[in-house]
Structures are given as structure tokens and as C-alpha cells.
């Protein structure tokens, strides 16, 4: 299998940002992806996307642009799915 690396910039859609509920949904999806995924805000230090505490600690608000990176088989597909999750408004 071929190792691939992918990166996406995504604008956060949830009205209240990545608070507990959307952060939990996102972190669980990142964990279920089975490959390493990181999330970073404003070009800062990347956090493990599968860690709900790491995601919440970034203080991501609605409209923030974040960078997702994944490394492994299916990285493009994984980031497509995670990007859709982050762009959706889970507070609607």
C-alpha cells in the first residue's frame, strides 16, 4: 500500500465552535480513521485530532480556519470526511 500525506484548510461551521459535543464527534471520527490526523489553528502547533482534550484546548471558534493533516493510506478520503464534519453546523 502507498503512504500518502494530505492537508486541508477548513472553516469551522458550528455556531459555537468546537466545544464539547462537536469536538467529541470530530475526535471520535479522527480516531476511527485509523491513521494519524492532526489539527492546528492559525498555523500553531498541531494537536492530535483524535484527542478530545487536545481539540478543545485549541479554542476553535466559528469561522476559524484550521489546518488538518493526515498521513497514511486513504489520507485524502479521511480528510474529505473530517472536513465535511467540521464545516457543518452541529449547533443548528
Predicted regions and their residues:
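C-terminal structural segments of small proteins and small subunits
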Residues: 59-92
Amino acid at each position: 500500500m502507498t503512504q500518502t500525506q494530505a492537508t486541508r484548510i477548513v472553516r469551522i461551521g458550528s455556531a459555537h465552535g468546537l466545544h464539547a459535543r462537536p469536538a467529541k464527534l470530530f475526535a471520535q471520527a479522527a480516531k476511527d480513521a485509523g491513521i494519524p490526523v492532526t489539527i492546528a489553528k492559525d498555523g500553531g502547533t498541531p494537536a492530535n485530532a483524535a484527542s478530545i482534550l487536545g481539540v478543545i484546548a485549541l479554542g476553535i471558534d466559528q469561522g476559524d480556519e484550521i489546518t488538518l493533516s493526515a498521513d497514511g493510506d486513504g489520507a485524502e478520503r479521511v480528510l474529505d470526511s473530517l472536513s465535511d464534519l467540521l464545516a457543518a453546523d452541529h449547533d443548528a
